[in-house]
């Protein structure tokens, strides 16, 4: 599974920001922004 680049938009499980999950900069928003 490829990880999305730092600060890019994470819009699917295949674009993980941390582990296998997208980490949100703002709670309950989707797509989320990568923080790592």
Swiss-Prot record:
GO terms for cellular component: extracellular region. The keyword Disulfide bond applies. Expressed by the venom gland. GO terms for molecular function: calcium channel regulator activity; ion channel inhibitor activity; toxin activity. It is found in: Secreted. Disulfide bonds join 3-17, 10-22, 16-34. Keywords: Calcium channel impairing toxin, Disulfide bond, Ion channel impairing toxin, Knottin, Neurotoxin, Secreted, Toxin, Voltage-gated calcium channel impairing toxin. It holds the Pfam family Toxin_12. Belongs to the neurotoxin 10 (Hwtx-1) family. 53 (PNTx27C4) subfamily. Neurotoxin. Causes spastic paralysis and death in mice. Moderate inhibitor of L-type calcium channels (Cav1/CACNA1). The presence of a 'disulfide through disulfide knot' structurally defines this protein as a knottin. This is Neurotoxin PRTx26An0C3.
